[in-house]
Curated annotation (Swiss-Prot):
One of the primary rRNA binding proteins, this protein initially binds near the 5'-end of the 23S rRNA. It is important during the early stages of 50S assembly. It makes multiple contacts with different domains of the 23S rRNA in the assembled 50S subunit and ribosome. Forms part of the polypeptide exit tunnel. The keyword Nucleotidyltransferase does not apply. This is Large ribosomal subunit protein uL4. Part of the 50S ribosomal subunit. It comes from Actinobacillus pleuropneumoniae serotype 5b (strain L20). One of its GO terms (molecular function) is rRNA binding. Pfam families: Ribosomal_L4 (PF00573).
């Protein structure tokens, strides 16, 4: 199959990478696993056994008129322990390489079908200036875009840092969440070839 390149000849690409059927279940599983892997999982609370304090009974069982109490660290007391205290845990989910690559291919194919994938011969700017990048995106009628280049361009990266709806990645830095998060994905012809090799 062929992809149209802005201002250049069409680019011949693999049908298996850019022409796959949309597999929503697979994409959902991989995106959820990716998001789960990004969780810090470091929260920690203390149970009544871990809270600092005396183990002495606050007052005698009977005769005071107050509710009976055996421990100042009880979960119903202020500054007591937490009943089901959260502990640090690993939220990551296992995703096979074949599944991950399949999800990326399915997303790329859907971007092509929805005409959200914009292929350019090259995408670079002379200086790390945000206004230069904004103008270049305007020329392509874009304002919400993920820019993928074969190698990370420092000028592009620095220029895009201050733009809320623009991100710059190299081929090694793409992930399923980023690919679906933007209205358009701008990709260079060299990056397309690299992605095909990476997902082969």
């Amino acid at each position: 199959m062929e992809l149209q390149v802005v201002g250049a000849n069409a680019l011949t690409v693999s049908e298996t990478t850019f022409g796959r059927e949309f597999n929503e279940a697979l994409i959902h599983q991989v995106v959820v696993a990716y998001a789960a892997g990004a969780r810090q999982g470091s929260r920690a609370q203390k149970t009544r056994a871990e809270v600092s304090g005396s183990g002495k009974k606050p007052w005698r069982q009977k005769g005071t008129g107050r509710a009976r109490s055996g421990d100042i660290k009880s979960p119903i007391w202020r500054s007591g322990g937490i009943t089901f205290a959260a502990k640090p845990q690993d939220h990551s989910q296992k995703v096979n390489k074949k599944m991950y690559r399949g999800a990326i291919k399915s997303i790329l194919s859907e971007l092509v079908r929805q005409e959200r994938l914009v292929v350019v011969e090259k995408f670079e700017i002379e200086a790390p200036k945000t206004k230069v990048l904004v103008q270049k995106l305007k020329d392509l009628a874009l304002n919400d875009a993920l820019i993928i280049t074969a190698n990370l361009d420092e000028n592009l990266f620095l220029a895009a840092r201050n733009l809320y709806k623009v991100d710059v990645r190299d081929v090694q830095g793409i992930d399923p969440v980023s690919l679906i998060a933007f209205d358009k994905v701008v990709i260079t012809a060299d990056a397309v070839k690299q992605i095909e090799e990476m997902l082969a």
